Amino acid sequence: MRSLAPGIKLITSFSRDSWYRFSILILTFVFYTSYHLSRKPISIVKSQLHRNCSNVIHPADLNITDNDTWCDWAPFDQNNYQNLFGVLDNCFLVAYAFGMFFSGMFGERLPLRYYLSSGMLLSGLFTALFGLGFYWRIHSLWYYCLVQALNGLVQTTGWPAVVACVGNWFGKGKRGFIMGIWNSHTSVGNILGSLIAGVYVSSAWGLSFIVPGIIIACTGVICFFFLVEKPEDVNCTPPQHHESVEQEPLLRNSSSNEEIFSSHTSTAVEPVEDHTEAISFCGALKIPGVVEFSLCLLFAKLVSYTFLYWLPLYISNIAHFDPKEAGDLSTLFDVGGIVGGILAGLISDYSGGRATTCWAMLIIAAPMLFLFNKIGQNGLPTTVGMLLWCGALVNGPYALITTAVSADLGTHECLRGNSRALSTVTAIIDGTGSIGAAVGPLLAGLISPTGWNNVFYMLITADVLACLLLSRLVYKEIRGWCGYTTRQRG
Protein backbone atom coordinates (compact mmCIF):
# COMPACT_ATOMS: atom_id res chain seq x y z
CA MET A 1 0.00 0.00 0.00
CA ARG A 2 1.39 3.37 -1.02
CA SER A 3 1.80 5.95 1.73
CA LEU A 4 0.44 9.49 1.49
CA ALA A 5 2.77 12.33 0.65
CA PRO A 6 4.06 14.16 3.77
CA GLY A 7 2.33 17.38 2.74
CA ILE A 8 -1.02 15.66 2.37
CA LYS A 9 -0.53 13.95 5.74
CA LEU A 10 0.02 17.36 7.30
CA ILE A 11 -3.11 18.78 5.67
CA THR A 12 -5.33 15.86 6.70
CA SER A 13 -3.98 15.81 10.27
CA PHE A 14 -5.91 18.98 11.07
CA SER A 15 -9.66 19.24 11.22
CA ARG A 16 -11.86 21.45 9.08
CA ASP A 17 -12.41 23.74 12.08
CA SER A 18 -8.66 24.11 12.54
CA TRP A 19 -8.06 25.15 8.95
CA TYR A 20 -10.80 27.75 9.12
CA ARG A 21 -9.34 29.15 12.36
CA PHE A 22 -5.90 29.27 10.81
CA SER A 23 -7.23 31.08 7.74
CA ILE A 24 -9.00 33.67 9.93
CA LEU A 25 -5.76 34.36 11.81
CA ILE A 26 -3.84 34.82 8.57
CA LEU A 27 -6.49 36.98 6.90
CA THR A 28 -7.03 39.31 9.86
CA PHE A 29 -3.25 39.53 10.31
CA VAL A 30 -2.87 40.69 6.71
CA PHE A 31 -5.80 43.09 7.01
CA TYR A 32 -4.51 44.96 10.04
CA THR A 33 -0.93 44.86 8.76
CA SER A 34 -2.19 46.88 5.80
CA TYR A 35 -3.90 49.38 8.13
CA HIS A 36 -0.64 50.12 9.95
CA LEU A 37 1.35 49.99 6.73
CA SER A 38 -0.74 52.88 5.41
CA ARG A 39 -0.30 54.96 8.61
CA LYS A 40 3.48 54.82 8.80
CA PRO A 41 4.62 56.83 5.72
CA ILE A 42 3.93 60.25 7.28
CA SER A 43 6.61 59.67 9.93
CA ILE A 44 9.16 58.76 7.24
CA VAL A 45 8.27 61.63 4.90
CA LYS A 46 8.49 64.33 7.60
CA SER A 47 12.27 64.50 7.36
CA GLN A 48 11.91 65.01 3.58
CA LEU A 49 9.24 67.71 3.83
CA HIS A 50 11.61 69.83 5.94
CA ARG A 51 15.35 69.34 5.47
CA ASN A 52 18.60 71.15 6.11
CA CYS A 53 18.82 72.65 2.63
CA SER A 54 22.31 74.05 3.13
CA ASN A 55 23.62 70.48 2.88
CA VAL A 56 21.65 69.70 -0.29
CA ILE A 57 23.14 70.35 -3.72
CA HIS A 58 20.66 72.43 -5.70
CA PRO A 59 20.20 72.28 -9.47
CA ALA A 60 22.20 74.90 -11.37
CA ASP A 61 19.17 76.12 -13.32
CA LEU A 62 17.06 76.68 -10.19
CA ASN A 63 16.53 80.26 -9.05
CA ILE A 64 16.86 80.15 -5.27
CA THR A 65 15.46 82.96 -3.13
CA ASP A 66 16.05 81.36 0.29
CA ASN A 67 19.08 79.12 0.70
CA ASP A 68 17.75 77.65 3.96
CA THR A 69 14.34 76.44 2.73
CA TRP A 70 14.60 76.02 -1.06
CA CYS A 71 14.42 72.20 -0.84
CA ASP A 72 11.52 72.09 1.66
CA TRP A 73 7.90 71.41 0.75
CA ALA A 74 5.63 74.33 1.55
CA PRO A 75 3.87 74.88 3.92
CA PHE A 76 6.38 72.89 6.00
CA ASP A 77 9.26 75.21 5.06
CA GLN A 78 8.55 77.55 7.97
CA ASN A 79 10.39 77.82 11.28
CA ASN A 80 7.40 76.33 13.12
CA TYR A 81 7.47 73.18 10.97
CA GLN A 82 7.51 70.92 14.05
CA ASN A 83 4.27 72.47 15.27
CA LEU A 84 2.76 71.99 11.80
CA PHE A 85 3.78 68.33 11.83
CA GLY A 86 2.13 68.01 15.24
CA VAL A 87 -1.08 69.52 13.86
CA LEU A 88 -0.96 67.14 10.90
CA ASP A 89 -0.57 64.12 13.20
CA ASN A 90 -3.32 65.36 15.44
CA CYS A 91 -5.82 65.70 12.61
CA PHE A 92 -5.52 61.97 12.01
CA LEU A 93 -5.36 60.93 15.66
CA VAL A 94 -8.18 63.12 17.01
CA ALA A 95 -10.46 61.94 14.21
CA TYR A 96 -9.38 58.36 14.94
CA ALA A 97 -10.07 58.70 18.67
CA PHE A 98 -13.46 60.34 18.05
CA GLY A 99 -14.53 57.81 15.45
CA MET A 100 -13.39 54.80 17.46
CA PHE A 101 -16.09 55.26 20.12
CA PHE A 102 -18.76 54.97 17.42
CA SER A 103 -16.97 52.41 15.28
CA GLY A 104 -17.46 49.63 17.81
CA MET A 105 -21.22 50.14 17.90
CA PHE A 106 -21.38 50.08 14.10
CA GLY A 107 -19.24 46.96 14.11
CA GLU A 108 -21.72 45.15 16.39
CA ARG A 109 -24.65 45.98 14.10
CA LEU A 110 -23.18 45.71 10.58
CA PRO A 111 -21.71 42.67 8.80
CA LEU A 112 -17.99 42.67 9.61
CA ARG A 113 -17.04 41.65 6.07
CA TYR A 114 -18.72 44.68 4.51
CA TYR A 115 -17.55 46.97 7.30
CA LEU A 116 -13.89 45.98 6.97
CA SER A 117 -13.89 45.94 3.17
CA SER A 118 -15.36 49.42 2.83
CA GLY A 119 -13.01 50.75 5.52
CA MET A 120 -9.91 49.45 3.75
CA LEU A 121 -11.01 50.75 0.35
CA LEU A 122 -11.64 54.23 1.76
CA SER A 123 -8.36 54.14 3.72
CA GLY A 124 -6.55 53.37 0.48
CA LEU A 125 -8.25 56.31 -1.22
CA PHE A 126 -7.34 58.89 1.45
CA THR A 127 -3.80 57.57 1.89
CA ALA A 128 -3.23 57.91 -1.85
CA LEU A 129 -4.79 61.41 -1.88
CA PHE A 130 -2.11 62.61 0.55
CA GLY A 131 0.60 61.38 -1.82
CA LEU A 132 -1.13 62.87 -4.85
CA GLY A 133 -0.54 66.27 -3.27
CA PHE A 134 3.07 65.85 -4.43
CA TYR A 135 2.10 65.36 -8.07
CA TRP A 136 -0.66 67.96 -7.98
CA ARG A 137 1.77 70.39 -6.29
CA ILE A 138 -0.61 71.19 -3.46
CA HIS A 139 0.91 73.42 -0.77
CA SER A 140 -2.18 74.03 1.35
CA LEU A 141 -2.00 72.86 4.96
CA TRP A 142 -5.79 72.55 4.99
CA TYR A 143 -5.72 69.97 2.21
CA TYR A 144 -3.31 67.69 4.06
CA CYS A 145 -5.15 68.18 7.36
CA LEU A 146 -8.52 67.31 5.77
CA VAL A 147 -7.15 64.18 4.11
CA GLN A 148 -5.53 63.09 7.39
CA ALA A 149 -8.76 63.65 9.34
CA LEU A 150 -10.89 61.69 6.86
CA ASN A 151 -8.32 58.90 6.84
CA GLY A 152 -8.39 58.81 10.63
CA LEU A 153 -12.16 58.34 10.62
CA VAL A 154 -12.22 55.47 8.13
CA GLN A 155 -9.27 53.73 9.78
CA THR A 156 -11.42 53.18 12.88
CA THR A 157 -13.20 50.41 10.99
CA GLY A 158 -10.20 48.14 11.40
CA TRP A 159 -9.36 47.33 14.99
CA PRO A 160 -12.76 46.58 16.57
CA ALA A 161 -13.73 44.47 13.58
CA VAL A 162 -10.61 42.28 13.42
CA VAL A 163 -10.56 41.71 17.20
CA ALA A 164 -14.26 40.80 17.15
CA CYS A 165 -13.67 38.41 14.28
CA VAL A 166 -10.76 36.66 16.02
CA GLY A 167 -12.73 36.59 19.27
CA ASN A 168 -15.59 34.87 17.46
CA TRP A 169 -13.27 32.06 16.39
CA PHE A 170 -10.96 31.58 19.39
CA GLY A 171 -11.79 30.78 23.01
CA LYS A 172 -9.95 31.91 26.10
CA GLY A 173 -7.37 29.12 26.32
CA LYS A 174 -3.87 30.39 25.37
CA ARG A 175 -5.47 33.58 24.08
CA GLY A 176 -2.55 35.73 25.27
CA PHE A 177 0.01 33.68 23.33
CA ILE A 178 -2.13 33.41 20.18
CA MET A 179 -2.96 37.10 20.15
CA GLY A 180 0.58 38.05 21.14
CA ILE A 181 1.85 36.46 17.94
CA TRP A 182 -1.13 37.70 15.93
CA ASN A 183 -0.70 41.26 17.22
CA SER A 184 2.73 41.44 15.61
CA HIS A 185 0.76 42.72 12.60
CA THR A 186 1.06 46.19 14.16
CA SER A 187 4.85 46.10 14.12
CA VAL A 188 5.04 44.22 10.81
CA GLY A 189 2.82 46.90 9.26
CA ASN A 190 5.00 49.67 10.70
CA ILE A 191 8.16 47.97 9.42
CA LEU A 192 6.76 47.40 5.92
CA GLY A 193 5.33 50.91 5.85
CA SER A 194 8.73 52.35 6.79
CA LEU A 195 10.60 50.28 4.22
CA ILE A 196 8.14 51.00 1.39
CA ALA A 197 8.04 54.72 2.18
CA GLY A 198 11.84 54.76 2.47
CA VAL A 199 12.23 53.48 -1.09
CA TYR A 200 10.51 56.56 -2.55
CA VAL A 201 11.02 59.26 0.11
CA SER A 202 14.11 60.87 -1.43
CA SER A 203 13.01 60.71 -5.07
CA ALA A 204 9.22 61.12 -5.13
CA TRP A 205 7.69 61.16 -1.65
CA GLY A 206 4.17 61.02 -3.08
CA LEU A 207 4.70 57.34 -3.92
CA SER A 208 5.45 56.73 -0.23
CA PHE A 209 1.69 57.19 0.28
CA ILE A 210 0.27 56.01 -3.04
CA VAL A 211 1.83 52.54 -2.93
CA PRO A 212 0.59 51.76 0.62
CA GLY A 213 -2.81 53.13 -0.39
CA ILE A 214 -3.00 50.66 -3.27
CA ILE A 215 -1.93 47.81 -0.97
CA ILE A 216 -4.63 48.42 1.66
CA ALA A 217 -7.28 48.82 -1.05
CA CYS A 218 -6.29 45.43 -2.49
CA THR A 219 -6.58 43.79 0.94
CA GLY A 220 -10.08 45.27 1.18
CA VAL A 221 -11.03 43.36 -1.97
CA ILE A 222 -9.55 40.16 -0.48
CA CYS A 223 -11.59 40.74 2.69
CA PHE A 224 -14.82 41.05 0.72
CA PHE A 225 -14.28 37.72 -1.04
CA PHE A 226 -12.80 35.55 1.71
CA LEU A 227 -13.60 36.69 5.30
CA VAL A 228 -15.85 34.40 7.37
CA GLU A 229 -17.16 36.31 10.38
CA LYS A 230 -18.36 33.48 12.64
CA PRO A 231 -17.83 29.69 12.88
CA GLU A 232 -21.57 29.16 12.61
CA ASP A 233 -21.57 30.70 9.11
CA VAL A 234 -19.66 27.68 7.74
CA ASN A 235 -20.99 25.06 10.20
CA CYS A 236 -17.85 25.07 12.36
CA THR A 237 -17.85 24.59 16.13
CA PRO A 238 -17.94 27.85 18.15
CA PRO A 239 -15.18 28.29 20.76
CA GLN A 240 -15.53 28.09 24.55
CA HIS A 241 -15.22 31.55 26.06
CA HIS A 242 -15.78 30.70 29.73
CA GLU A 243 -14.99 28.13 32.34
CA SER A 244 -17.81 25.96 33.64
CA VAL A 245 -17.25 27.15 37.22
CA GLU A 246 -19.52 29.77 38.74
CA GLN A 247 -16.92 32.39 39.62
CA GLU A 248 -13.97 33.55 37.53
CA PRO A 249 -11.25 35.88 38.85
CA LEU A 250 -10.78 39.10 36.91
CA LEU A 251 -8.87 38.33 33.72
CA ARG A 252 -7.47 35.03 34.99
CA ASN A 253 -6.88 32.40 32.32
CA SER A 254 -8.49 29.02 31.96
CA SER A 255 -6.30 26.17 33.15
CA SER A 256 -7.52 23.97 30.32
CA ASN A 257 -5.01 22.89 27.71
CA GLU A 258 -6.97 24.14 24.70
CA GLU A 259 -4.89 23.72 21.56
CA ILE A 260 -4.77 26.22 18.72
CA PHE A 261 -5.46 23.60 16.11
CA SER A 262 -7.28 20.91 18.07
CA SER A 263 -8.89 18.35 15.80
CA HIS A 264 -11.41 17.29 18.44
CA THR A 265 -14.16 19.34 20.04
CA SER A 266 -14.70 19.25 23.78
CA THR A 267 -18.12 18.17 24.95
CA ALA A 268 -17.92 20.76 27.73
CA VAL A 269 -18.45 23.64 25.33
CA GLU A 270 -21.44 25.54 26.55
CA PRO A 271 -24.11 26.37 23.98
CA VAL A 272 -23.92 29.75 22.36
CA GLU A 273 -26.89 31.90 23.14
CA ASP A 274 -28.50 33.83 20.34
CA HIS A 275 -28.62 37.40 21.62
CA THR A 276 -30.65 39.68 19.41
CA GLU A 277 -29.30 42.95 20.83
CA ALA A 278 -25.73 44.22 21.01
CA ILE A 279 -24.43 45.56 24.31
CA SER A 280 -24.85 49.29 24.98
CA PHE A 281 -21.98 51.71 25.51
CA CYS A 282 -22.79 52.15 29.21
CA GLY A 283 -23.26 48.42 29.62
CA ALA A 284 -19.77 47.81 28.26
CA LEU A 285 -18.31 50.33 30.71
CA LYS A 286 -19.76 48.31 33.61
CA ILE A 287 -17.73 45.22 32.72
CA PRO A 288 -15.06 44.85 35.45
CA GLY A 289 -11.68 46.13 34.29
CA VAL A 290 -12.79 48.06 31.20
CA VAL A 291 -12.31 51.52 32.73
CA GLU A 292 -8.92 50.75 34.31
CA PHE A 293 -7.41 49.17 31.21
CA SER A 294 -8.86 51.91 28.98
CA LEU A 295 -7.19 54.66 31.02
CA CYS A 296 -3.95 52.70 31.23
CA LEU A 297 -3.93 52.34 27.45
CA LEU A 298 -4.43 56.09 27.10
CA PHE A 299 -0.95 56.70 28.53
CA ALA A 300 0.65 53.56 27.06
CA LYS A 301 -0.53 54.49 23.58
CA LEU A 302 0.61 58.08 24.11
CA VAL A 303 4.16 56.76 24.42
CA SER A 304 3.89 54.25 21.58
CA TYR A 305 2.41 56.69 19.05
CA THR A 306 4.87 59.42 19.92
CA PHE A 307 7.59 57.00 18.86
CA LEU A 308 5.56 55.95 15.82
CA TYR A 309 5.31 59.51 14.49
CA TRP A 310 8.49 61.16 15.79
CA LEU A 311 11.19 58.48 16.10
CA PRO A 312 12.54 58.78 12.52
CA LEU A 313 12.80 62.57 12.85
CA TYR A 314 14.45 62.21 16.28
CA ILE A 315 17.03 59.77 14.87
CA SER A 316 17.63 62.04 11.87
CA ASN A 317 18.11 65.15 14.04
CA ILE A 318 20.13 63.64 16.89
CA ALA A 319 22.14 60.90 15.16
CA HIS A 320 22.35 62.79 11.83
CA PHE A 321 21.15 60.01 9.54
CA ASP A 322 19.53 60.77 6.19
CA PRO A 323 15.72 60.24 5.93
CA LYS A 324 15.95 56.72 4.48
CA GLU A 325 18.53 55.51 7.02
CA ALA A 326 16.55 57.02 9.91
CA GLY A 327 13.38 55.32 8.67
CA ASP A 328 15.12 51.96 8.32
CA LEU A 329 16.70 52.23 11.77
CA SER A 330 13.36 53.14 13.37
CA THR A 331 11.96 49.75 12.32
CA LEU A 332 14.05 48.15 15.09
CA PHE A 333 11.65 49.70 17.61
CA ASP A 334 8.86 47.69 15.98
CA VAL A 335 10.99 44.54 15.87
CA GLY A 336 11.34 44.88 19.64
CA GLY A 337 7.58 45.44 19.80
CA ILE A 338 6.93 42.08 18.14
CA VAL A 339 9.05 40.27 20.73
CA GLY A 340 7.51 42.29 23.57
CA GLY A 341 3.95 41.49 22.49
CA ILE A 342 4.64 37.75 22.28
CA LEU A 343 6.44 37.71 25.65
CA ALA A 344 3.63 39.68 27.30
CA GLY A 345 1.09 37.17 25.99
CA LEU A 346 3.13 34.16 27.12
CA ILE A 347 3.83 35.54 30.59
CA SER A 348 0.21 36.56 31.16
CA ASP A 349 -1.04 33.13 30.01
CA TYR A 350 1.37 31.35 32.34
CA SER A 351 0.82 33.63 35.35
CA GLY A 352 -2.87 34.39 34.80
CA GLY A 353 -2.16 38.07 35.48
CA ARG A 354 -2.82 40.37 32.56
CA ALA A 355 -2.64 43.55 34.68
CA THR A 356 0.51 42.49 36.54
CA THR A 357 2.30 41.68 33.29
CA CYS A 358 1.46 45.10 31.86
CA TRP A 359 2.45 46.84 35.09
CA ALA A 360 5.85 45.12 35.28
CA MET A 361 6.77 45.95 31.69
CA LEU A 362 5.65 49.57 32.02
CA ILE A 363 7.61 50.12 35.23
CA ILE A 364 10.78 48.79 33.59
CA ALA A 365 10.15 50.88 30.46
CA ALA A 366 10.44 54.19 32.36
CA PRO A 367 14.18 53.93 33.23
CA MET A 368 14.89 52.38 29.82
CA LEU A 369 13.44 55.47 28.11
CA PHE A 370 15.70 57.65 30.26
CA LEU A 371 18.73 55.58 29.25
CA PHE A 372 17.74 55.70 25.58
CA ASN A 373 17.73 59.48 25.65
CA LYS A 374 21.08 59.64 27.46
CA ILE A 375 23.15 56.96 25.74
CA GLY A 376 21.09 55.92 22.71
CA GLN A 377 23.28 57.91 20.32
CA ASN A 378 26.63 56.56 21.55
CA GLY A 379 27.36 54.47 18.49
CA LEU A 380 25.24 52.29 16.24
CA PRO A 381 25.30 49.13 18.45
CA THR A 382 23.99 51.12 21.44
CA THR A 383 21.26 52.71 19.33
CA VAL A 384 20.18 49.32 17.99
CA GLY A 385 20.11 47.74 21.45
CA MET A 386 18.15 50.57 23.05
CA LEU A 387 15.61 50.63 20.20
CA LEU A 388 14.98 46.90 20.62
CA TRP A 389 14.63 47.08 24.41
CA CYS A 390 12.41 50.17 24.41
CA GLY A 391 10.26 48.74 21.62
CA ALA A 392 9.65 45.53 23.58
CA LEU A 393 8.84 47.27 26.87
CA VAL A 394 6.68 50.04 25.38
CA ASN A 395 4.71 47.99 22.85
CA GLY A 396 4.38 44.81 24.94
CA PRO A 397 1.70 46.16 27.33
CA TYR A 398 0.04 48.09 24.50
CA ALA A 399 -0.22 44.88 22.46
CA LEU A 400 -1.54 42.83 25.38
CA ILE A 401 -4.25 45.34 26.33
CA THR A 402 -5.52 45.85 22.79
CA THR A 403 -5.71 42.12 22.03
CA ALA A 404 -5.97 39.49 24.78
CA VAL A 405 -7.29 41.87 27.45
CA SER A 406 -9.89 43.36 25.09
CA ALA A 407 -11.01 39.88 24.00
CA ASP A 408 -11.15 38.69 27.63
CA LEU A 409 -13.29 41.65 28.66
CA GLY A 410 -15.43 41.46 25.52
CA THR A 411 -16.30 37.84 26.36
CA HIS A 412 -16.29 38.32 30.13
CA GLU A 413 -18.05 35.77 32.29
CA CYS A 414 -20.75 38.29 33.21
CA LEU A 415 -21.79 38.47 29.52
CA ARG A 416 -22.32 34.71 29.28
CA GLY A 417 -21.07 34.18 25.73
CA ASN A 418 -22.42 37.37 24.18
CA SER A 419 -19.55 37.93 21.74
CA ARG A 420 -21.47 40.90 20.32
CA ALA A 421 -19.88 42.91 23.11
CA LEU A 422 -16.44 42.29 21.63
CA SER A 423 -16.46 45.10 19.10
CA THR A 424 -17.88 47.69 21.53
CA VAL A 425 -15.48 46.80 24.36
CA THR A 426 -12.53 46.81 21.97
CA ALA A 427 -13.60 50.20 20.60
CA ILE A 428 -13.93 51.71 24.09
CA ILE A 429 -10.48 50.51 25.13
CA ASP A 430 -8.76 51.45 21.88
CA GLY A 431 -10.75 54.68 21.55
CA THR A 432 -9.63 55.84 24.99
CA GLY A 433 -6.10 54.82 24.11
CA SER A 434 -6.37 56.79 20.89
CA ILE A 435 -6.94 59.97 22.88
CA GLY A 436 -3.44 59.43 24.24
CA ALA A 437 -2.24 58.60 20.74
CA ALA A 438 -3.55 62.00 19.62
CA VAL A 439 -2.15 63.94 22.57
CA GLY A 440 1.34 62.36 22.52
CA PRO A 441 2.50 63.42 19.04
CA LEU A 442 0.90 66.85 19.51
CA LEU A 443 2.78 67.38 22.78
CA ALA A 444 5.96 66.16 21.12
CA GLY A 445 5.50 68.76 18.39
CA LEU A 446 5.01 71.51 20.97
CA ILE A 447 7.77 70.38 23.34
CA SER A 448 10.50 69.32 20.89
CA PRO A 449 11.57 72.93 20.07
CA THR A 450 12.58 73.23 23.75
CA GLY A 451 14.75 70.12 23.49
CA TRP A 452 14.31 66.38 23.03
CA ASN A 453 15.12 65.82 26.72
CA ASN A 454 11.78 67.35 27.66
CA VAL A 455 9.95 65.07 25.21
CA PHE A 456 11.43 62.02 26.93
CA TYR A 457 10.52 63.35 30.38
CA MET A 458 6.93 63.63 29.14
CA LEU A 459 7.03 60.02 27.90
CA ILE A 460 8.45 58.74 31.20
CA THR A 461 5.72 60.55 33.14
CA ALA A 462 3.05 58.95 30.94
CA ASP A 463 4.57 55.51 31.57
CA VAL A 464 4.44 55.98 35.33
CA LEU A 465 0.82 57.16 35.19
CA ALA A 466 -0.11 54.07 33.18
CA CYS A 467 1.37 51.91 35.95
CA LEU A 468 -0.54 53.74 38.67
CA LEU A 469 -3.87 53.23 36.90
CA LEU A 470 -3.39 49.45 37.01
CA SER A 471 -2.52 49.36 40.71
CA ARG A 472 -5.94 48.18 41.91
CA LEU A 473 -6.11 45.33 39.40
CA VAL A 474 -2.52 44.29 40.17
CA TYR A 475 -3.37 44.21 43.88
CA LYS A 476 -6.39 41.97 43.21
CA GLU A 477 -4.35 39.60 41.07
CA ILE A 478 -1.61 39.31 43.68
CA ARG A 479 -4.19 38.62 46.38
CA GLY A 480 -5.62 35.90 44.15
CA TRP A 481 -2.19 34.29 43.82
CA CYS A 482 -1.78 34.41 47.59
CA GLY A 483 -5.02 32.49 48.11
CA TYR A 484 -7.42 35.32 48.86
CA THR A 485 -10.85 35.27 47.23
CA THR A 486 -11.44 38.25 44.96
CA ARG A 487 -14.88 39.76 45.09
CA GLN A 488 -16.27 40.47 41.64
CA ARG A 489 -17.92 43.69 40.64
CA GLY A 490 -20.98 43.90 38.41
Question: For the regions a protein language model found, what residue spans apply to each?
Answer:
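Cytosolic juxtamembrane N-terminal segment immediately preceding the first transmembrane helix
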Residues: 1-37, 42-43, 51, 55-76, ...
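Extracytoplasmic gate region of multi-pass secondary transporters
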Residues: 42-44, 287-342, 398-403, 439-440
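Cytoplasmic membrane-interface "Motif A"-like loop-to-helix N-cap segments
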Residues: 108-120, 349-363
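Hydrophobic core of transmembrane alpha-helices in multi-pass small-molecule transporters
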Residues: 126, 140-157, 298, 380-410
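Helix-loop-helix hairpin linking two adjacent transmembrane segments in secondary transporters
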Residues: 186-234
